[in-house]
């Protein structure tokens, strides 16, 4: 009789910015068995060690939050060197785009194990987008939403008050563990971009907020925290004779809005050329789904996307142009006053896009309740994601 408890191998469950998730877990090179109820994240050694260190620190810090284990998947992690991947392990390995960027492929992964480590973690359930697609009934979606709101209020907001920012919240980084209607947990994962930052303390500018491309799950204004913007905008201010001694800078910049729009448009083009498109295409897809019923000409969608991004950045610049005592440009006022308070909320809200997209694709067959949710989500996206945030 065969032993049905033997775990034969792991398959790729998902891929992220730093590694690929396998379920069941991969085997460590010093063990003969695979861990049960565990998944593995195969990563370059330096990223695995970095994330493991982050998790240890986070667990020690966030454990003071009541029921923190219900909101964050940050405990019971371990790292090890991987054993040789089996044929089953290599199933769908081509989906592991993260390692492919580092020239590690299905063909050479077993000869590249010295470069890799496994981050083992408890199984936390399905990603929010997968859960939405598999569970379309109204009751389960309402339950999911209730747990999401608990995550926001009792987890994310409390964490932010402790000056800790996940910085990469999105549907694929939120897991829902649905055992039954009375036992459901929704938790944050993937803490590789976490930032610990205390505002107004003149700390080093966090590296995870510097020189970033456009991203769909953080405010567009993240692309203002670049060396290119600092230098080009400083030159713009000099050209328009705006200095630390200028009075009513905001009023003056409003009078020069047309110049600012041109400047921001040119900056975005230069930054995309320098850093790449980032998530621009996906942002355009979101805008398409939000506004296609309002705009007859599909070609106008891309124009609208550009207009939304430009307007967002222009308003930030108008309202948050400040100078340091030495007369140099000061981007910290916006970072400390606004950005840190909205970065994780932004990601949390956009995590609902898979639900909106599902309703969008089935728009003509939506019932009254679904249509109401669809309209509410659209309103929330526009209000909290795409209108410029110049106050919390």
Per-region residue spans from a language model:
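Conserved N-terminal boundary motif of the eukaryotic protein kinase catalytic domain
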Residues: 2-12
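C-lobe/activation-segment region of protein kinase-like
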Residues: 183-362
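Catalytic-loop of the protein kinase fold
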Residues: 159-178
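A conserved short helix/loop substructure at the end of the activation segment
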Residues: 384-392
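ATP-binding glycine-rich loop module of kinase domains
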Residues: 17-101, 106-107
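Conserved structural core of kinase catalytic domains
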Residues: 68-144, 200, 230, 235, ...
């Amino acid at each position: 009789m065969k032993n049905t408890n033997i775990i034969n191998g792991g398959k790729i469950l998902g891929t992220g910015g730093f590694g690929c998730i396998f379920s069941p877990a991969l085997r460590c090179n010093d063990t003969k068995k695979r861990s049960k109820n565990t998944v593995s994240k195969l990563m370059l050694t330096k990223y695995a060690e970095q994330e493991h260190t982050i998790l240890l620190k986070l667990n020690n810090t966030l454990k003071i939050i009541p029921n923190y284990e219900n909101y964050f998947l940050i405990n019971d992690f371990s790292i090890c060197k991987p054993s040789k991947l089996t044929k089953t392990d290599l199933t769908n390995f081509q989906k592991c785009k993260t390692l492919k960027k580092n020239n590690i492929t299905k063909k050479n992964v077993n000869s590249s194990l010295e470069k890799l480590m496994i981050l083992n973690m408890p199984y936390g359930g399905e990603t929010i987008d997968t859960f939405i697609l598999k569970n379309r009934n109204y009751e389960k979606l309402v339950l999911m939403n209730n747990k999401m709101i608990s995550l926001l209020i009792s987890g994310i907001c409390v964490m932010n008050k402790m000056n800790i920012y996940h910085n990469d919240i999105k549907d694929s980084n939120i897991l829902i563990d649905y055992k039954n209607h009375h036992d459901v947990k929704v938790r944050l994962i993937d803490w590789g971009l976490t930032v610990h930052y205390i505002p107004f303390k003149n700390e080093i500018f966090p590296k995870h907020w510097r020189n970033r491309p456009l991203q769909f799950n953080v405010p567009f204004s993240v692309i203002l925290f670049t060396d290119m913007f600092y230098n080009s905008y400083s030159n713009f201010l000099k050209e328009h004779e705006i200095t630390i001694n200028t009075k009513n800078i905001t009023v003056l910049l409003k009078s020069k809005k047309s110049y600012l729009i041109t400047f921001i448009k040119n900056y975005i083009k230069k930054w995309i050329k320098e850093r790449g498109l980032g998530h621009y295409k996906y942002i355009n897809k979101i805008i398409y789904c939000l506004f296609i019923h309002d705009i007859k000409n599909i070609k106008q969608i891309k124009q609208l996307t550009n207009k939304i991004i430009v307007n967002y950045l222009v308003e930030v610049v108008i309202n948050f142009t400040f100078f340091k005592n030495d007369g140099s440009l000061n981007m910290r006022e916006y970072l400390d006053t606004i950005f840190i308070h909205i970065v994780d909320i932004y990601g949390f809200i956009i995590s609902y896009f898979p639900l909106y997209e599902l309703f969008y694709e089935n728009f003509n067959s939506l019932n009254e309740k679904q249509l109401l949710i669809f309209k509410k989500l659209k309103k929330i996206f526009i209000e909290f994601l795409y209108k410029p945030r110049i106050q919390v």
